[in-house]
Every structure is written in structure tokens, then in C-alpha cells.
Amino acid sequence: MKKTAFILLLFIALTLTTSPLVNGSEKSEEINEKDLRKKSELQRNALSNLRQIYYYNEKAITENKESDDQFLENTLLFKGFFTGHPWYNDLLVDLGSKDATNKYKGKKVDLYGAYYGYQCAGGTPNKTACMYGGVTLHDNNRLTEEKKVPINLWIDGKQTTVPIDKVKTSKKEVTVQELDLQARHYLHGKFGLYNSDSFGGKVQRGLIVFHSSEGSTVSYDLFDAQGQYPDTLLRIYRDNKTINSENLHIDLYLYTT
């Protein structure tokens, strides 16, 4: 009996000293790594387009914009959004539903999102770019100082330090898209997240989890892509999901197998 109790206590001690913890909760509560999609499962052009979206392409970032214009009832059209752009003048934002759009229609808003032109339907043909979500109200939503969002990163179960300044926001209520775009930009720059194996892309699977102060979470499988072009790859942001930035942190899990 004493031997059994000693073995049990030893096992518990080893578990506590070897399992990475975040805010007192083991990382295993968030994911089942076996359910993550593999990079090799992506459609032919998806990987290169994900690389373009999250690392190379410009983002639509502005403050204090207002529009009553629409193409469909679930959209807002910002005319003259782009200045000096070689192709686009206007930005058409798809918010997924009439109710979601009415929340921002005619109000001062801030925009932060990834836009695309190919397969963009609405506005002036060939002069309008499209974007899913990325909208927050401007008034009473500004922090007194920019917040740097802490990031916990595990690579194959081993915790790795991430500089504190890689994901930032000046908003109290921020879209998950704004945070996700910054986080994936860092991951690709540091680890070649969306590079092919032949170009040094060692990461094969991954998950990003956003934890709010209220205890709610939002997560994305980093390789669970819809289709292979931006008009479908970016659709994950159509719900314009937002999260409170107070006590917010991000957990990242990368796997090389």
C-alpha cells in the first residue's frame, strides 16, 4: 500500500513539473491535437494564398469612418476608402447579416481587416475590394494606451517565448480578425507557417486560441482552410466576432508532425 501511494505521489509531482500551465489550466483542456488539419490537406493554391494574406498583403486599417451606403443588406460600402491604390477606390464590407450591419450603419467605425479583389462582387466593377468583418464602433472604444497582448506558444509541447509586442491593439472591444492577422503574420515571419516543406515550412499543424477576461474563447485551426482563394479563405471573419481586450491573452500550439 505504501509503495502504491509513493508511486502515485511521484506521478502527480512529475505531471505538475512537466506540464506547461497557462493561468492555472493545462493546455490539454483547449485542444485535441489529433483533430487538427494537416498542411498537406490544403487545396493546391491555398497555401500560397494564405501566405499572401497573412504576411505580404496590405490590410484595410483606418479609424473614424462612416457609411450609409450598401450593396446588399448585409454589407457596408465605403466609397473612396482607398487613396492612391493602383486598382481599388471603394471597400465593400460583408458583415454576414442585416442585423449585424445595422449595428454599424451610419455610425463612426474603425476598420481592421484583410481585403481581396478576385471574386469580389459588389460596388464599382474592378474598382472595389471586399472584406469580411473587421469592424468595431469608434466612440467610447479607445484605450488610454496601446495594449500589448501576451502570447503563450508551444511547439511540439515545448513552451517557447514570444516577444510581448507582436500583437497590439488600441481598442477595448477588438475584432478577433485584428488579433489573428497580427499573430499569423508573426508566425509566418518567425517559423515560415505557410511555407511549403521544400521552402523550410516545418510546421504541419497548428491552433490559435484567444482567451477573454470573461472566460470565453475563440479558436481557429491554422490549416483548416475553406477553398483555396481569399474570397473563401477569409470567410472565417464574416461573423465579425469581437473580444474584450482586458486581460486578453493568446495561446498558440504548433506541431511539426
UniProtKB/Swiss-Prot annotation:
It is found in: Secreted. PROSITE patterns: STAPH_STREP_TOXIN_1, STAPH_STREP_TOXIN_2. Coiled coil: none annotated. Disulfide bonds join C120-C130. Staphylococcal enterotoxin that activates the host immune system by binding as unprocessed molecules to major histocompatibility (MHC) complex class II and T-cell receptor (TCR) molecules. In turn, this ternary complex activates a large number of T-lymphocytes initiating a systemic release of pro-inflammatory cytokines. Also causes the intoxication staphylococcal food poisoning syndrome. Binds 1 zinc ion per subunit. The zinc ion is necessary for the toxin interaction with MHC class II. Its cofactor is Zn(2+). It holds the Pfam family Stap_Strp_toxin. Zn(2+) binds at H211, H249, D251. It comes from Staphylococcus aureus. Its main location: secreted. This is Enterotoxin type E. Keywords: Disulfide bond, Enterotoxin, Metal-binding, Secreted, Signal, Superantigen, Toxin, Virulence, Zinc. Interacts with host MHC class II molecules composed of alpha/HLA-DRA and beta/HLA-DRB1 chains. Interacts with host T-cell receptor beta variable TRBV7-9. InterPro entries: Enterotoxin, Staph/Strept_toxin_CS, Staph_tox_OB, SuperAg_toxin_C, Superantigen_bac, Toxin_b-grasp_Staph/Strep, Toxin_bac. The keyword Secreted applies. GO terms for molecular function: metal ion binding; toxin activity. GO terms for cellular component: extracellular region.
